[in-house]
Amino acid sequence: MKIKINRIVEGAKIKLPARAHYNDAGADVYTTYGETLKPHETRRIPLGFSLELPDGVMACVFPRSGMSLEGLVCELPPIDSDYTGEVHAIVTNLTDKLKKVPGGTRIGQLVVIPIVLPDFVEQLGEERGDSAFMSTGEA
């Protein structure tokens, strides 16, 4: 699958998402500018690009294990296919210290995920029980 990426600032030296290995689930994403997060602060960190996701997929910026060990974690709000703005990493500093994140830091991993688009209905037109374990009789 090919997904179009648009640089937010043309000609800027923005690092675009890149996989370290061909079969990695996520592509590393990088901070555009240096950031300093206060203790327990959550902030949107711009990544310098937007995506043109096809229908039927979403994306999330997952935490990197190395950043998590330092007390910086990415939250996981979905990036829907109709969102065309700049992609951000939503990062929380879980520590009691200021955390500096230099520009160009690998802050997370962009993962594209296929989704099911259900129709939510009140009735399916079939009888279903609300019992669970041993609901069909003795073993």
Which residues does each predicted region cover?
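DUTPase catalytic domain/fold
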Residues: 1-139
